[in-house]
Amino acid sequence: MKSAIVALALALALPAAAQSPVVTVKESPRWGSFQVSLSLFSPDIDSEFTNAVHPPYATIFGTGRPLMVQAQFNKSVWITEYGTLDIGVGAGFWEAWGQGYYQGTDGTVIRGGSTSLMIIPVQAQVGYRFEWFYERFNVPLEPYVRGALLDYIWSTSGQSGVSSWTSPLDGVSYRGSGATFGWSATLGLAIVLDAFDTSLSRQMDYDVGINRTLLFFDFTRSSVNDFGSTKSWQLAPSYWAWSAGLQFVF
């Protein structure tokens, strides 16, 4: 009797199971990405004052590295099973505060009022993210490379606004603001956070269209002196600058 009841239950369950649809969840189509990053930054302005007893940048602003904040927006132009090629634009903000000075007749440094140097880095970039490890083996690591053309918009300010100076020799006025061009090359590694919580990843994709979230770390080498002009400051760091941030792929 028990065998007959079990057989009947199985017979009733099989049609229902056969009719149950199998749902396959796929990522939404990719369009591009948005990222934000933080880095410690210090321009190499003093590189042209190698013999100076009091190099101007270090004397005024010190040897610290204030925080630079940057954001980038990318369009994915080529997506394959191996990786993604992106083109995009970016901008950021950086500012250092210090105390102005002038040199007395006896050579001593005399401190003046507070002053600042502000830089707004603007860039156009192209990058490639190698996604094969994650796509093929589910290893949540994506190395990437990026190259960029840079435009650093800068200004120096004192207590009364943007700094200006008139030469006593020829009467020419100089204003403490301008734009300097350059380039950068970046090597980095991104961690695919979706691999650690796939259900949350699918929900974010369904709700807002973000189909991948990356935590990245990279190192950048750059030069910002109007491509070697002797009339321009070197506004890039003298070292490989690190940065870290989040990238949202949508």
Language-model segments: which ranges?
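Outer-membrane beta-barrel pore domains and translocons
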Residues: S39-F41, G90-W94, A148-Y152, A190, ...
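Gram-negative (and chloroplast) outer-membrane scaffold detector with strong preference
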Residues: V69-Q159
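Hydrophobic, lipid-facing positions within transmembrane beta-strands of outer-membrane proteins
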Residues: G32-F34, R65-A71, I120-V126, P143, ...
